[in-house]
């Protein structure tokens, strides 16, 4: 008990946390980190009182503007009128953390924290910043003028100090350095997954794969970065029956209308349906009903959903702009260049024409790969190293 009482306090300040689910992988990373490292660190959260950018209603199952016990962490949910620098300052003083962890570079909460630290309005404390893919070319191309302006301002005002940066992969490390320069403390640790995904999985529950048909799922927040509109043109060339269900929050209504207009012109053998957001506890039971997972994303720093898909026996059909590479050599899917739509047509046609036996082998390998990857002890070790490195670095400001 004494050991638990002496754990270093890590204050995580983020836009969204449990019981939410619509903000996707960034939220899952935090929840998994708390679950797996909660015996080593005393996690506290300051977060908003609602779920994602599309849902503005406050949670009804937590106490707002008070501390709540959520799993292995204490969580303070800010009402909209209390998302202010002065409120953050008081809460940081109250917690008196050993380190602060931020999971977005562009969040208003991050701006508040970095400004408070720079102006010495709070006690000096190490800052860990995990930008969660925000520096990928695809992500930066969206609202690029606003983002570039903020990057220039942050540098000129010297808000970045001696931050400890957490990248989920070597490719994300390179993206951060390309934008902010190489003179940074960047540590690489994969985003924290759960210890096992879909423990009671049964291969027999997968749907039969008939030659000439395939069921695919696009499970993601629906936004321009996920690049669904790009996929529609290659789909026109596919012979045979192909259905794609879009599962996730339609975060960009204008973008969805653009896509919908194209969807309405698709040939009759291509079926595209929208299913809306899926609560996280239902994700695996949903994924297992599909043959393949598809996502032509402009960039992902990690992609929890890829692990969930493979754990559900769904081979991946994704762009080559994620850390999950060489999938074809591993026999668990395909990572394809967006520059060559023809390669997507070839793979999609192959999937449609695959026999049940061929599909079963591919599905089994995808599941086995995910299970073995999740067992790696280096996942916890590398994430603990990031937190311990920051704690041992002193205030850093």
Each language-model region and where it sits:
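N-terminal subdomain of nucleotide-sugar transferases
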Residues: 1-58, 66, 397
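A conserved mid-protein helix/loop that constitutes part of the nucleotide-sugar donor-binding site
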Residues: 28-31, 214, 218-237, 254-257
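Nucleotide-activated donor-binding/catalytic signature segment of Leloir-type glycosyltransferases, i.e.
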Residues: 74, 256-281
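Short hydrophobic beta-strand element within catalytic cores of glycosyltransferases
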Residues: 315-319
